[in-house]
Amino acid sequence: MDTQTHSLPITHTQLHSNSQPQSRTCTRHCQTFSQSCRQSHRGSRSQSSSQSPASHRNPTGAHSSSGHQSQSPNTSPPPKRHKKTMNSHHSPMRPTILHCRCPKNRKNLEGKLKKKKMAKRIQQVYKTKTRSSGWKSN
């Protein structure tokens, strides 16, 4: 019976030893992520041109892996560049923040998204009210 009681704490410590590296890797990931966020914010404020080539590098890297599109790089990037330039300020930040499990970033992101959703909702309600009142008065 002594061996069984000794085996239980060993497995318990093994569980803790397995969970600690995961938490360490998460904190390391969050720390590196927050540093990259700060650098990207600084870059977007001071050097907006430095961020645009980085956003163009990602699509070209994706095209080179596909093979077919890498043969004609001159024809495919222009329409994609137009799409990327419109979303370049928002899209690179969203997926990276969502993947990080830092509670501070998640709360900030949720607050920003809620504000945007509420603003869109208010605009939609206002439009529908003005349309419905316009139809009734005419």
Swiss-Prot record:
Q: Where in the cell is it found?
A: Nucleus; Nucleus, Nucleolus; Chromosome
Any idea which positions bind Zn(2+)? Answer: H12, H16, C26, C30
The keyword DNA-binding appears for this protein = yes
Q: State the InterPro entries in the record.
A: TP2 (IPR000678)
Q: Which GO terms describe its cellular component?
A: nucleolus; nucleosome
- Entry GO MF terms: DNA binding; zinc ion binding
- Keyword Zinc annotated: yes
The record's similarity note reads: Belongs to the nuclear transition protein 2 family.
**What is the name of the protein in this document?**
Nuclear transition protein 2
Gene symbol here is TNP2
